């Protein structure tokens, strides 16, 4: 261990010698502290007693005060950093630019091109003996210099293009890496921790913590440094990240005071003195070791990667992003993380599959091209021209074969979409950067894209939907219900004394109210917001809680039962001077009231509190408060007389019972003003919002109505946690998916829920197979116990302000403002990523199809590709790197929220896109072939076809090349719209990158054509020829308008491409129109069809039911992820026939909106999200049958017709 110590001390960049010399002013050395922190439990206690006496002794040696902390003097901080190190673990060195260049060179297609170019170069300098070139066929026998010059220029130009492609790729990777390092440091800066300095409690960045700091530790913290406990309340730590021990470890001064960095506080609170930071902390030591061993592992991994890369060939290039949560994360990650991994991101899966398919097709085409060229040449030379094979002709023939090989490789280069991973990376990187401005700090790249597919959001209430600024607005004190805060004199003196002491000591001492930052502003609430509301209540009663706290400091508290999600209450025991004990308790009113056997009456004396009285208070006080959306808290106490033996404090159930109720208060937490609008947007976008909260059901329902999660007259479900558990579990208490499936489609509010309930709900929705598309669930969480739900969800959002470190660790995105509207922005960005990729694909596949067909046909007919290797590489650069940059950086618009989610199995290339790809490819091929075979006549120039081996560039082929590039440039503008919109220029000037790239490419094209000469096989063109090229290019814009006029539904032969998962055969009728796809050209057509659709709806329903039964036989055998179909007709609950289960009414019987059917009939036409799942129980089957037959549920084709209008 000693070696290890030296190792990491050296690592921290401060020389050992300096440290040891300097320790003189502190009574303890770095090495001593490190060896102390390696001990646990009793060993550590013995060592502390032996060397330092007690923890106070360590504080003395570290020159710090347990109550006042460090002075915060800059000189002192600097000295401590010099001796004990900074709280910073050096990150792994980033890859250098040269390493990234080397990685880019590993691309298989580029390696083939490099070899071909080198062979071409070598042969161009080879002069065959004798002058019999004329016997060898059609070689251009001009001046020897010119011939050799032309020969080497092509090889050199290919090499140069390869260098360009490699440099651009490496630069992109480098800037991406730089950006994510910036993101990482931003995440680190966001992390703050509470310490005491100069007697003041302040929050400082984790990196600024130094040895000797007194840090406050509370529930949910991720400890940033090693330390020793000075004072603790019921502290339990999860040390599994360091020790692998799954049980929570109790920490106390007399058992085990050692707190280690990287561990999570699962319960309780306390204070510790920091004894080791950075590379000297337990986490730091492990990181240092990993850093040393990491390089060797990296080399091993690279070897493996090379093997797989060689095997996968071009297809390997298509892995868009090795994401944090990708299935193919390396083994090391698996070992290090004991949390469940999420499955591969949807887009990644689809892209990988599509790219492999394109790669295979490209490989096939290039192979056929080379074979045809070689055969044609051999047959023409040997049989047609009857030339003998002469030894001196061999090099020249080899040059021909190399030329054919280069053509084949360039066909492959153009066909293989290397730009695909680049487009994904750029789009995600661009989005992540911009999302930061929208208060979304993305931790895992995939999450950004997955959010675009989200179909359900399970949101917390407090702080996300509400403002998290809590105030007491009503109170029930001395048997009187005050609708506003009572005057202090209205409350009997002894009740006031109980209130003041009970609230002051039974709220965490970290919760406090500070004066406003600006004059006239609101006071600042620090710590738990509910506790701040209670402290604020005391201030409203003209009492100061701080006086009580000064009198009873935290160390004097005898025992604290801290708040957790199981208890839903907090209790504190005080020891009085006469030896008696008093316990104060506060918590959810219905929970604490059940433990109350007495209540303080109007004269302030305790009187008997019977169950009947409790029911009266619930009906007359608590329910009215809750129905106004108030959170109700009950305050109570109990005395333990002095004469009796001291209670067994660990036996909580016997202690916190037989209480006397002091008061019940109603706390208001107003709904954020922007939330109702954001929820409407979600519902319009086909996303169901559910509220999961710990509050009681009436409070939750009232808030849900205010937010718009529930609307009056709807028959959606509101359940409490225990009711939810009763319905989803069988007699043995096991959760059954079938039971969850009967509840979740209608569930909108889950109240009084524990984190386990939240996890169960999320898992149930994700695992459900009742819809064709698997649900994509986003979850918000702030508590330590929300970790499992955040991990299980497709996208986990943690609260940046109220969230615990544990929740942030488990999340994918951190909401820096804790606001629900930021989630809606994340949806918008996610859908934008999807659209950006689709735009790029639409553009690229058009170029691919045209370039491959032109090269292939040209090669077969004229033994030469009309587009030369270097030109192809330039086109490749345009369409891969530059187009991916241009199209992947389009900003999102509100229109993205008018569509339903794409769904996991929706193909990347929709039928509208397929129509655009084939339509534009047709136009471009007609233009190119017309120019290729009739260009010389049209422009009255020499033909470039059948030119000899080293002929100078021809005007003819230059016009073909130039027109081809112009068509791509204008088609890039067309590619901006993928849903059949007419106006392709809409918002074009909002995207400066797009305009810059299009103009830049145009300028470079002019330079290449006019001055490129032999290297680019270009000849200068006249103004007239240029105008023709541009005119034919602009033709793609007009042609695009013509294509968008043709309704997609008429083109039955079109299929989609790029399915992420295995795809079933779908009957042709069902393919008539995509559910989520809005082709704007069809809107006019649709209006007339709606009545017709309505008339046919019942028949369609019956057909769907039959289809459902037919397909479910097969679908039941498949995994949920692999089932895929474009429609999710058959699984809508309207079409499900319930079995003879015992019927449980699915409306909570306390629901105020029980007369839903009558109200519903009188309401205006349903909103997109209304009655999302109309029939969920046999009880409603008869009453709702007619409605379900004529209503359209979101996701059904009819519904998409109605809403699109």
UniProtKB/Swiss-Prot annotation:
<feature type="compositionally biased region" description="Basic and acidic residues">
    <location>
        <begin position="322"/>
        <end position="343"/>
    </location>
</feature>
<keyword id="KW-0067">ATP-binding</keyword>
<dbReference type="InterPro" id="IPR006068">
    <property type="entry name" value="ATPase_P-typ_cation-transptr_C"/>
</dbReference>
<dbReference type="InterPro" id="IPR044492">
    <property type="entry name" value="P_typ_ATPase_HD_dom"/>
</dbReference>
<keyword id="KW-0406">Ion transport</keyword>
<feature type="topological domain" description="Cytoplasmic">
    <location>
        <begin position="425"/>
        <end position="840"/>
    </location>
</feature>
<feature type="topological domain" description="Cytoplasmic">
    <location>
        <begin position="890"/>
        <end position="912"/>
    </location>
</feature>
<dbReference type="InterPro" id="IPR006408">
    <property type="entry name" value="P-type_ATPase_IIB"/>
</dbReference>
<feature type="binding site">
    <location>
        <position position="460"/>
    </location>
    <ligand>
        <name>Mg(2+)</name>
    </ligand>
</feature>
<dbReference type="InterPro" id="IPR001757">
    <property type="entry name" value="P_typ_ATPase"/>
</dbReference>
<dbReference type="GO" id="GO:0005524">
    <property type="term" value="F:ATP binding"/>
</dbReference>
<feature type="topological domain" description="Cytoplasmic">
    <location>
        <begin position="977"/>
        <end position="990"/>
    </location>
</feature>
<keyword id="KW-0597">Phosphoprotein</keyword>
<feature type="region of interest" description="Disordered">
    <location>
        <begin position="1145"/>
        <end position="1205"/>
    </location>
</feature>
<feature type="transmembrane region" description="Helical">
    <location>
        <begin position="957"/>
        <end position="976"/>
    </location>
</feature>
<feature type="active site" description="4-aspartylphosphate intermediate">
    <location>
        <position position="460"/>
    </location>
</feature>
<keyword id="KW-0479">Metal-binding</keyword>
<dbReference type="Pfam" id="PF00702">
    <property type="entry name" value="Hydrolase"/>
</dbReference>
<keyword id="KW-0460">Magnesium</keyword>
<dbReference type="GO" id="GO:0005388">
    <property type="term" value="F:P-type calcium transporter activity"/>
</dbReference>
<feature type="transmembrane region" description="Helical">
    <location>
        <begin position="991"/>
        <end position="1012"/>
    </location>
</feature>
<dbReference type="GO" id="GO:0005516">
    <property type="term" value="F:calmodulin binding"/>
</dbReference>
<keyword id="KW-1003">Cell membrane</keyword>
<dbReference type="Pfam" id="PF00690">
    <property type="entry name" value="Cation_ATPase_N"/>
</dbReference>
<feature type="topological domain" description="Extracellular">
    <location>
        <begin position="1013"/>
        <end position="1024"/>
    </location>
</feature>
<dbReference type="GO" id="GO:0043231">
    <property type="term" value="C:intracellular membrane-bounded organelle"/>
</dbReference>
<keyword id="KW-0106">Calcium</keyword>
<feature type="transmembrane region" description="Helical">
    <location>
        <begin position="1025"/>
        <end position="1045"/>
    </location>
</feature>
<dbReference type="Pfam" id="PF00689">
    <property type="entry name" value="Cation_ATPase_C"/>
</dbReference>
<dbReference type="InterPro" id="IPR008250">
    <property type="entry name" value="ATPase_P-typ_transduc_dom_A_sf"/>
</dbReference>
<dbReference type="GO" id="GO:0051480">
    <property type="term" value="P:regulation of cytosolic calcium ion concentration"/>
</dbReference>
<keyword id="KW-1278">Translocase</keyword>
<feature type="topological domain" description="Extracellular">
    <location>
        <begin position="372"/>
        <end position="403"/>
    </location>
</feature>
<dbReference type="GO" id="GO:0046872">
    <property type="term" value="F:metal ion binding"/>
</dbReference>
<dbReference type="InterPro" id="IPR023298">
    <property type="entry name" value="ATPase_P-typ_TM_dom_sf"/>
</dbReference>
<feature type="topological domain" description="Cytoplasmic">
    <location>
        <begin position="1046"/>
        <end position="1205"/>
    </location>
</feature>
<keyword id="KW-0109">Calcium transport</keyword>
<feature type="transmembrane region" description="Helical">
    <location>
        <begin position="105"/>
        <end position="125"/>
    </location>
</feature>
<feature type="modified residue" description="Phosphothreonine; by PKC">
    <location>
        <position position="1101"/>
    </location>
</feature>
<feature type="transmembrane region" description="Helical">
    <location>
        <begin position="404"/>
        <end position="424"/>
    </location>
</feature>
<comment type="similarity">
    <text>Belongs to the cation transport ATPase (P-type) (TC 3.A.3) family. Type IIB subfamily.</text>
</comment>
<feature type="transmembrane region" description="Helical">
    <location>
        <begin position="352"/>
        <end position="371"/>
    </location>
</feature>
